[in-house]
């Protein structure tokens, strides 16, 4: 599907976005191995999160409901059953990486696969710690999906992440739930901590301090009533749209503002963005609030180190924004983007050039000069949801009608993206 986007006169209105993708995955998985029912409201509508539901159902978990409301009938740590066939993770790296930690502890063998894009994404980062815990995992070419996971009794380990990754951290912690003793994960740079918050919410004994997370194995997890905050990564596209287009004033309600994710807002405010958060509330251990944003002239800057890790999913749309700043934007330490749904460094640069923007690709990032004009163009999502949405935002500031090729890629995380954009773009 191709989508035509006209320049916007302004981005205005008040919107509520679908549930956070990262939190939805975690709630579905933990609810399945908790005892009793968990009611999940505002579950993500994205295809990735429904891949997780499909996998849990295949493992014998009854999940009722539809749309954004589900009840997961948990069976406890030892309640999963061997699936009748292979598990399908679709396009979801979160599903295959995090769920593998649970599968590694099961008394049966599981084969889990994904689509063509996921089949190109390396899995050594989860295979190594799980092997140390006692699991046997076979992979295509020793690193790519499908994975064949021979589960069994696991041992607790003390593991240091070689690079920051919330998915790998979660995989090890999920495996640690089934091991006797304490499993410790040390991360070089703080990554999003939704897993730690959710595990505590379900009753796990877990401590986190100075980059070290320690989990006591074999806890009794208890089902909960849960509300998923709106996804800040989805909000990022509309925040950037409002910042880019003159005369814009936008309100986004009920957004998850976990400090490990809100670095995006701190970055933008530091660049001069007119962003307000009138009040914060706590919901299932997660902070939520309303974001108010207006068109702003931004200075630009450098994204590197821990900041890069904190905004890794938002870098495609931040790259678009960088071209409109006064000083431009330099992004470093983002090599992880090379192994996302696409090589996001290459696909961002390719589409920026179509936009008429000068951009330089580096081994682990991008250099984007500022004060550049956007022209109408035909953009290609290359099947990557974040690329599709980032360049739809770019098109709002173009000098004519643009086309997003393969626009349906957005449905992986945000099926309502196009209708929401039409509602707020004047």
UniProtKB/Swiss-Prot annotation:
Keywords, ordered alphabetically: Amino-acid biosynthesis, Aromatic amino acid biosynthesis, Cytoplasm, Transferase
Keyword Cytoplasm: yes
Principal subcellular localisation of the protein: cytoplasm
GO CC annotations on file: cytoplasm
Transmembrane intervals: none
Catalysed conversion reaction: 3-phosphoshikimate + phosphoenolpyruvate = 5-O-(1-carboxyvinyl)-3-phosphoshikimate + phosphate
Compartmental location: Cytoplasm
Active site feature: 313 (proton acceptor)
Gene Ontology annotations of biological process type: amino acid biosynthetic process; aromatic amino acid family biosynthetic process; chorismate biosynthetic process
Binding site for 3-phosphoshikimate: 21-22, 26, 165, 167, 313, 340
E.C. number: 2.5.1.19
Pfam families (alphabetical): EPSP_synthase
Molecular-function GO term, any one: 3-phosphoshikimate 1-carboxyvinyltransferase activity
Domain of life: Bacteria
Binding site for phosphoenolpyruvate: 21, 93, 121, 167, 344, 386
InterPro entries associated with the record: Enolpyruvate_Tfrase_dom, Enolpyruvate_Tfrase_sf, EPSP_synthase, EPSP_synthase_CS, RNA3'P_cycl/enolpyr_Trfase_a/b
Keyword RNA-binding on entry: no
Family indicated by similarity: Belongs to the EPSP synthase family.
Role, per record: Catalyzes the transfer of the enolpyruvyl moiety of phosphoenolpyruvate (PEP) to the 5-hydroxyl of shikimate-3-phosphate (S3P) to produce enolpyruvyl shikimate-3-phosphate and inorganic phosphate.
Official protein name in the record: 3-phosphoshikimate 1-carboxyvinyltransferase
Source species of the chain: Solibacter usitatus (strain Ellin6076)
Gene: aroA
């Amino acid at each position: 599907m191709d989508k035509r986007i006209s320049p916007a006169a302004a981005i205005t209105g008040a919107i509520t976005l679908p549930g956070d993708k990262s939190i939805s995955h975690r709630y579905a998985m933990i609810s399945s191995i908790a005892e009793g029912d968990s009611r999940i409201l505002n579950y993500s509508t994205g295809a990735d999160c429904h891949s997780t539901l499909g996998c849990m159902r295949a493992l014998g978990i009854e999940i009722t409901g539809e749309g954004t409301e589900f009840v997961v009938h948990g069976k406890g740590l030892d309640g999963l059953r061997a699936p009748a066939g292979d598990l399908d993770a679709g396009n979801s790296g979160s599903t295959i990486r995090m769920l593998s930690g649970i599968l590694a502890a099961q008394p049966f063998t599981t084969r889990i696969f994904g689509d063509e894009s996921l089949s190109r994404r390396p899995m050594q980062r989860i295979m190594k710690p799980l092997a140390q815990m006692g699991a046997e995992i076979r992979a295509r070419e020793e690193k790519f999906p499908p994975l064949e996971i021979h589960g069994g009794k696991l041992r607790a380990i003390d593991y240091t992440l070689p690079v920051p990754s919330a998915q790998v951290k979660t995989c090890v912690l999920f495996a640690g739930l089934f091991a006797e003793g304490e499993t410790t994960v040390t991360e070089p740079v703080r990554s999003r901590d939704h897993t730690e918050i959710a595990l505590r919410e379900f009753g796990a004994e877990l401590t986190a301090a100075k980059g070290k997370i320690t989990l006591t194995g074999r806890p009794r997890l208890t089902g909960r009533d849960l509300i998923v905050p709106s996804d800040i990564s989805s909000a990022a596209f509309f925040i950037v749209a409002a910042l880019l287009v003159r005369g814009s004033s936008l309100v986004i309600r009920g957004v998850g503002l976990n400090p490990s994710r809100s670095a995006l807002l701190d970055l933008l405010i530091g660049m001069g963005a007119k962003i307000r958060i009138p009040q914060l509330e706590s919901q299932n251990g997660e902070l939520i609030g309303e974001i108010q944003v207006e068109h702003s002239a931004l200075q630009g800057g450098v994204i590197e180190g821990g900041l890069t890790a904190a905004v890794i999913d938002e870098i495609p749309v931040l790259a678009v924004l960088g071209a409109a700043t006064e000083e431009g934007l330099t992004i470093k330490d983002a090599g992880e983007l090379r192994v996302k749904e696409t090589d996001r460094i290459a696909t961002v640069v390719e589409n920026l050039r179509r936009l008429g923007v000068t951009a330089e690709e580096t081994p682990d990032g991008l250099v984007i000069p500022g004060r550049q004009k956007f022209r109408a163009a035909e953009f290609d999502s290359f099947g990557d949801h974040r690329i599709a949405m980032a360049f739809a935002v770019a098109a709002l500031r173009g000098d004519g009608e643009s086309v997003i090729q393969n626009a349906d890629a957005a449905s992986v995380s945000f099926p309502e993206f196009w209708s929401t954009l039409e509602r707020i773009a004047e």
